[in-house]
Amino acid sequence: MLSWNNSWHSSSTENRTMEREIVASYEPKKNNEIRMFESSDEMATDLAEYISQVSEISIKERGYFAIALSGGPLISFMRKLCEAPYNKTLDWSKWYIFWADERAVAKNHVDSYYKSTKEDFLSKVPILNGHVYSINDNVTVEDAATDYEFVIRQLVKIRTVGVSESNDCPKFDLILLSIGSDGHVASLFPNHPALELKDDWVTYITDSPVPPPERITFTLPVINSASNIAVVATGEDKAKAVYFAISDGAEGPDAPSIPARMVQPTDGKLVWFLDKASASFLEAKTKNDGYEHPKY
């Protein structure tokens, strides 16, 4: 694994040299960290340890661990939490599960994030059923968003979910996101009006550019109010989106405004988990001074 923030470390001379070059070109913003992995198994191992540490700290400080998940291949990278030592050592009774976004489909539908999360994660760990806050799939997408925000507001009142010191938004202990090839996070898509919402905690869309069209999603203020945010990216098809989300070279009037770049914690920490393919444009920039910035 390569990892860089204010310091850097690596096991091989070659990796140390490459990492030093990347640090020079991509100095992360304050409280941001980027980790790059050689394999999916290495990423899953590190992600499990990261989540375990955030969980332990949150439970020690607050008595709860409130985590919001998203969809895509993200859940598969949590698989190590279902194995020793984590399945025995984590205080699962203090975990509270939410979704940063969800598709407006039945819970048993193949497109449901709840379904995939239950099959690949929840069914394998002893999290209490009453601590799993899924979306109401028996109402319209608009009502589902309203209901979900109401539920979260009640949990903020009793501090099961924390509250931001900077605003009245919920302060989740961890929001775990993936990134789309277009740079979307949660169900916040490029140039969508939902990106401009300031007061809503949860909103809905009916025009997702990728099916299914109806979804609910956390808004940017809620995402950015989290204590910790982790974004997982894998595959070459994510490389341009990762570049435009992270790179200072992607700034300027001609740079695309992608939602992933708008993920900047107000008072928390952001960690990017990247495989080599998704980080390929970042690496290419360090190896060739004449590298032309990718274009959408």
UniProtKB/Swiss-Prot annotation:
Keywords: Hydrolase. Pathway: Carbohydrate degradation; pentose phosphate pathway; D-ribulose 5-phosphate from D-glucose 6-phosphate (oxidative stage): step 2/3. One of its GO terms (molecular function) is 6-phosphogluconolactonase activity. CDD domains: 6PGL (cd01400). It comes from Oryza sativa subsp. indica (Rice). Its EC number is 3.1.1.31. It catalyses: 6-phospho-D-glucono-1,5-lactone + H2O = 6-phospho-D-gluconate + H(+). It is an enzyme of class 3 (hydrolase). This is Probable 6-phosphogluconolactonase 1.
